Each structure stands twice: as C-alpha cells, then as structure tokens.
C-alpha cells in the first residue's frame, strides 16, 4: 500500500506514535488498512458548502465500514456570488490553483492510498479535479448537490441569476421595491450550489460523464436523502477501487474529455467548463485543440435548457431523469459519446446509464426534438480572438445568428458597469471589456454584473459584450468571453477602438473587428506595455505565472526557470 511509506518499519515508529495520537486507529489491525483522505471543502459563508461537514461524517463512517481508515482535511472555498463585482472576484479563479496545490500537498505528504473528494461550488470541483489527476491516487468525487429553486410571492421560479437580473430591472424602475426584496429573501431557499446550470452544477454534472462520480452526482438535491446515500455508496466504491488500483488517469482520457464537452453541449453548460476542462486536459498531459470542441458541438444536439436559459432548475432536470437520461439519449446517436470507457463505478459509461429514459420531455428533449441540432457552446475565432473565445449560444436569443455593432471600449469591469448604469451603453453597441483576463484582471473576474444589467434593462438582444474576462454560469445574452490572447498579453482585443465595427457570427463561429491587418499592426506599435496591477501577495505571483484562457488559465513556470 502507498501508505506503508509512513507506517511500516522500525524507522517509522515516530510516525506511528503520531498516528496513534490522532485517535483514528481504533485497534492494532487498523495500521494494516488503507488510509483514505477525505478532501472536504466545508466553509460556512458558502451556502453550497455549509452542509459538507455532515456529508464528510457520513463518508468517514462508510469508509471505516468498508475496511479503511478515514482522515479528513479541508481546502479553501470562494463563493463567486458573494465575491462578485469587487476585488474579491480577482481571487475566484486563482483559488482553483490554491485548492489543487493544497490537496496535492496533503495527499503526497501523508501518502494516502485513496482520496474521497467533497466539492460543490465553482472553483472547488475543478481545483480538486486538478489535484486528483496530478496525484493520480485512487479517487472518487461526491459533490454537495444543488439547492432547491426559490419561489417568488407571485409563484415564479427563482435562481440566483434571477436576483442579478433583478438589480438591473430595479434600477430601470421595472421592478418594485417590495418585489425586489421578496426576490432577495426567496431566491436561495436551501443549502446547496445555486439551482441553475451555472458553473458549479455544470462541473458536477461533467464529473458523471468523465467517470469520476456516481450517476446523479450533478442533480440530486443537497437536502435529499439520495445525496446522503450517494456518499455512502461512493465511499464503498472508493475502497474497492483502492484494492483494484483504479486511478484517475485510467479514467480521464482524451475520450473522457470529449464526452465531458458533449454533455456540456447537450445541457448548455457554463462557459467556465471550457476553461476548467482545458486545464484538466493539460494536467493529464492531453494536448486538446479548441477546434475539437466545435467539432463536438456540431454533432451534439442541445437537449436540456436550464436556468438561466429557461425557468427549469437542476431539480427539474433530476426529476426528468438527470444526467443519466441525457447520457442515455446521447448514446442513441452513434459517435456522440465513447460509452465503453471505464468509470469509477468499475463499470463502463454505457453500463452506468443505459436504459435510463427521459421522464419529462418538456425538461429534457429527445434526439428527435432537440432545442437545437448543435450544442449550447461555441468556440469563436477571428482577428479579435486568434486563439479562440467562448460563447454560450444556448443563452442567446435563437433569432440572433449574426450581430454587428459599434464598439464601446472599457479597460476594466467597473468602468463598463458605470457606463451601463448611466445609460451610456445603448442599443447597437458591442461593449468591449479588456485587461480583465487571467493576467490582466488579475484573476479573470466574471462579468456577471454588466451582462445582467444589460439583460435587466431589456437590451439582451440589442447589445453584445465581448471580453478577455469570463462569465458566471448565470450569464445569458450575446456575451463572448475568454478572448485569447488577452489584452495584457498583447492580444488584439486591446487594439479595438470606440466606433469600430465588430461582428459576432454564430453561424461561422467567428469574431472580427472590421479593420485591416495593416491598421491593427499600426495600432499595436503604439500600444503601451501592460503593467501588473498587483505588486505583492498571491495575486502578484499569479499574474507572473498565469497563461491565457485558451490553455485553461493555468499557472506555468517558464521553462528557463525549471
């Protein structure tokens, strides 16, 4: 066993003394059992994580019943909704790397035989997944689950995205103070990740099709008994996989990454999934071309529109059959998935999901009646984004295939929000927000406030927004993010001027400014070099090492320093 490194031999008597002092070893034979880390992310300012201490206790009990010894440790967590729109958002994406590094440190320092990961919200799941792939120790994921959707006094279903858009509507006088406060009190009624197909739930659904979590991991409610039963089942599976030596890199293959994007397309997941999945591919040593994502989109039908793209919540999806029903439907179209891959259940993806039929065709459409014949995400290329950009086409009004407008440029999120609030941004504008990428932000903050204000003001079909920053999974409208290279790295988004004509073509998947190559080169010669905004602390180190979004926004040590 891997843990023999810290518990076998006379020379490890001091380590054994310390292990006895933990109280985790109940009898002499326990030293001969596998040591399992529970990598938890309990934190009580994050509603998606307030209940994870209880789930960890269930996991501990089940791991012990299965014949192994559990030890729990915690990672940090950032609530993107609370950190939104201020300096706190600079720390959200960078927290992913801290989580990965922290988990790697504990797992390798103590030579655990297996790891039970309990994530839930936005950066925690991908951070833990980076650690799982990096350490390649037998692992299983069981998230905390989504919260219930809220309900307004008028009986309207609510999610957190409803609240962000309500801010714009309230400022426009389209929503009364009473209705505004009612929504605030009722949008988030329980613990769990936010109720729509936002980043947290998108990633937790993808864990199912990647093969590192049990079926229904992405949709079973946080407050449900099924969630607790799933924790127990996952614990027994993990201990069995330790004995069989099934590791993450046996499961996370190029085909698994393909299938993750296919499910993402079918569910219209968050654009952040592209960022995180590319980072996972990089960590797994898989060279993954962005154009491959478009090829997957072309052959994957869009089957389930979930909030913010509709009024349906994750609970509605669960009741309609969950991810297993969507995966089963996709398997009926040959070439869409790779169903004979190994998963953490010890069975194939096909065996996990075959026969799981759709229970409500309003929530999950069939192959014969998709929302669209192509997936809900697209990668755009062009002279603004030579290395790619991402748009959630499932969140764009279906009538819009090509949008051309006049650029109105801002070098920060805050400048753009002020202009939108002051009605400087008008119909026909393409809002350009730059120097908000991984390096420029720093931290690639989410642009939820400006997109929500645009939609809340009723301009969702009349104003577009493009940025080298990113979006919340709650974003909808004509919103293009992850533009690469970013402005801080000399990307052409930094060359756009007010009044330039910008075209977003969803048919041909292009993003261009109507300027000649010569003019753009002339502008580049006059461009001032980017100066880092933060000079000390973690964000200064992050700025120095982070790459653009087309590589997943990973931190990379320059080769000349290795």
Swiss-Prot record:
[2Fe-2S] cluster binds at residues 121, 194. Gene3D superfamilies: IlvD/EDD C-terminal domain-like (3.50.30.80). Pfam families: ILV_EDD_C (PF24877), ILVD_EDD_N (PF00920). The active site is at 472 (proton acceptor). The modification N6-carboxylysine is found at residue 123. HAMAP family: IlvD. PANTHER family: D-XYLONATE DEHYDRATASE, D-XYLONATE DEHYDRATASE YAGF-RELATED. Belongs to the IlvD/Edd family. This is Dihydroxy-acid dehydratase. It comes from Staphylococcus haemolyticus (strain JCSC1435). The lineage of its organism: Bacteria, Bacillati, Bacillota, Bacilli, Bacillales.
């Amino acid at each position: 066993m891997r843990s023999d490194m810290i518990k076998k031999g006379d020379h490890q008597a001091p380590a054994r003394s310390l292990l006895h002092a933990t109280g985790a070893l109940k009898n002499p034979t326990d030293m001969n059992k596998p040591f399992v880390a529970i990598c938890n992310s309990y934190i009580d300012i994050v509603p998606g994580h307030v209940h994870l201490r209880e789930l960890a206790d269930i996991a501990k009990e089940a791991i012990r019943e299965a014949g192994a010894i559990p030890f729990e440790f915690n990672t940090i967590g950032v609530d993107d909704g609370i950190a939104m729109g201020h300096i706190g958002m600079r720390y959200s994406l960078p927290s992913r790397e801290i989580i990965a590094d922290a988990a790697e440190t504990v797992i390798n320092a103590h030579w655990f035989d297996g790891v039970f990961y309990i994530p839930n919200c936005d950066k925690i799941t991908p951070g833990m997944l980076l650690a799982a792939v990096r350490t390649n120790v037998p692992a299983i994921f069981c998230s905390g689950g989504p919260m219930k959707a809220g309900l307004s006094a008028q009986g309207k279903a609510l999610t957190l995205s409803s609240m962000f858009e309500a801010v714009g509507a309230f400022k426009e006088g389209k929503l009364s103070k009473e209705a505004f406060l009612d929504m605030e009190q009722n949008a988030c009624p329980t613990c769990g990740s936010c109720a729509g197909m936002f980043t947290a739930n998108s990633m937790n659904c993808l864990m199912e099709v990647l093969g590192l979590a049990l079926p229904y991991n992405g949709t079973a409610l946080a407050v449900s008994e099924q969630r607790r039963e799933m924790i127990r089942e996952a614990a027994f599976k993990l201990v069995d996989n330790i004995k069989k030596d099934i590791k993450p890199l046996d499961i996370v293959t190029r085909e698994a990454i393909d299938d993750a994007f296919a499910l993402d397309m079918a569910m219209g997941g968050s654009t952040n999934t592209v960022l995180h999945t590319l980072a996972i591919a990089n960590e797994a040593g898989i060279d993954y071309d962005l154009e491959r994502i478009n090829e997957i989109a072309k052959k994957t039908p869009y089957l389930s529109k979930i909030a913010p793209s509709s009024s349906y919540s994750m609970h509605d999806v669960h009741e309609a059959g969950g991810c297993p029903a969507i995966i089963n439907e996709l398997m009926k179209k040959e070439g869409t998935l790779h169903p004979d891959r190994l998963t953490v259940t010890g069975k194939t993806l096909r065996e996990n999901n075959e026969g799981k039929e759709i229970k409500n065709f309003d929530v999950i459409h069939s192959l014969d009646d998709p929302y669209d014949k192509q997936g809900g995400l697209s990668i755009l290329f062009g002279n603004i984004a030579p290395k790619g950009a991402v748009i959630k086409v499932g969140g764009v009004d279906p009538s819009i295939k090509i949008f051309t407008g006049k650029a109105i440029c801002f070098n920060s999120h805050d400048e753009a929000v002020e202009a939108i609030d002051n009605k400087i941004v008008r119909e026909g504008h393409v809002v350009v927000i730059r120097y908000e990428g991984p390096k420029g932000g720093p931290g690639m903050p989410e642009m939820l406030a400006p997109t929500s204000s645009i939609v809340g003001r009723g301009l969702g079909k009349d104003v577009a927004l493009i940025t080298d920053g990113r979006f919340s999974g709650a974003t909808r409208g004509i919103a293009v993010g992850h533009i690469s290279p970013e402005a801080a790295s000399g990307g052409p988004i930094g060359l756009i001027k007010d009044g330039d004509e910008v075209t977003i073509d969803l048919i041909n998947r292009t993003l261009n400014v109507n300027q000649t190559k010569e003019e753009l080169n002339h502008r580049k010669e006059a461009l001032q070099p980017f100066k880092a905004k933060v000079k000390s602390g973690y964000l200064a180190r992050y700025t120095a090492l982070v790459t653009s979004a087309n590589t997943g926004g990973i931190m990379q040590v320059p080769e000349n320093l290795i």
